[in-house]
Amino acid sequence: MKKIIIVCCYFGQKRKDYKTWLKSCEYNSNIDWLIFSDSDWGNTPPNVKIIKKTFNEIKEKIQSKFEFKITLNTPYKLCDYKPAYGYIFEEYIEEYDFWGYCDFDMIFGDIRKFLTDEILQQYDKIFKLGHLSLYKNTPGSNTLFKQDLGNYGTNYKEVFTTNEIKVFDEKQGINSIYELNNKKIYNEPCFINLSKFSKQIVVVRNENTKNNHSCQTVLFDQGKLYYIYKEKENINKEEIIYVHFSGKTFDSNGEEKYILTQNGVQKVEKDIEWKKIDNNFLWITLKINKLKKINFKIKRKIKNYISRREEINERKKQETIK
C-alpha cells in the first residue's frame, strides 16, 4: 500500500469542532497527519502527530528555503504556500509515496476506498481544491511550483512576496502548472462542498459536486461518509470521500453516527426520518446565497486592492528614504 502523509499548520485557538475532524482522521488509520501548531491538541489518534511550533518558527523555516525575502504576516496566508510543503518540509515526508495538505473545516470518509493504489499509481496530483490535495512525492514534483507560468498564471515569487491572497493552491497557481506540464490530475466528483452563504445544507455547484435536492444531508457512520438525498419518493445514498463546510461548525460530541443539519450535528440511531430533520430549504434561498457570494467576492477584491496600494506606497517610501 502506498504511504500517504498530510501536512497541516494551525495556529491560535482551535476550532470548537476539532474533535470531529480528529475522529474522522482516526478512522483513516492507514494515512498519517502531521500538524505544526502552537495549540494544545490533547490526546490525538496514533496516526495524527503534533509538532509544537509557533507561527514565527514556521515563518523562519519557510524563509530558510528561499533566497528572496518572503511575505508571511498571518497564518491565513499559508494557503498560498501549501503547494511548496513538499519542498519546505521535505525531511518529514521522505518515507512517503504521496504528501498533501487539507483544511480543518471538513470531515473525512473512507479515503482509501476512493484513492486506491491503482489511482495513486496513475496520477501525479489528487484533486484540484485546497480542501484536500495530494502530490506524488518526487524531487521533480516537489519543486514544480517554482516553474514560471508566464501569461497563464501567477509566478510563485510574486505569490510569496505579497500580502494578497493569490489562491496559489488552486486554479491560478499549482493546477495550471501541472496542466501545462501535462501532469495527470485526478479530479473525480466524489466529495461535497457546502455553501458558506447558507445556514441550510446547500451544496455548492461546480464541476466536482452534485445538484441540490429539497431534502438532503450528509451522514457520518463509523468512518464512512454519505451524501443522502430524497428524490421524488426515493432516498438515495452515495458514499463520498469528504465534506467541506467553510463558515460552519459541526461538533459531533463523540458520536459515531450522525447527520449534518442547519442546526448542527444530529445523532442517528436508526434509519433517517426526513420529518425529524430540520433541513428543508426553498430555492429562493439559493438565489439569496448567490447575491451574498457576489458581495463576498467584491469585498475580497477591495481588500486585495488596498493591500496592493499599501505595498506600492511602502516601496515609494523606501525609495524616498534612499
Task: List the model feature ranges, each with a label.
Residues 124-140:
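Short beta-strand-to-loop element that shapes/binds the nucleotide-sugar donor at the catalytic cleft/hinge
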Residues 82-127:
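GT-A fold catalytic core of metal-dependent nucleotide-sugar glycosyltransferases
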Residues 31-41, 52-53:
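Short beta-strand/loop segment that forms part of the nucleotide-sugar
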Residues 144-285, 289-290:
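Catalytic core and acceptor-binding pocket of nucleotide-sugar-dependent glycosyltransferases
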Residues 22-32:
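Short, acidic, metal-binding catalytic loop of nucleotide-sugar glycosyltransferases
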Residues 42-92:
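Active-site-proximal specificity loops/subdomain of glycosyltransferases
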Residues 1-20:
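N-proximal low-complexity "stem/linker" segments adjacent to membrane-targeting elements
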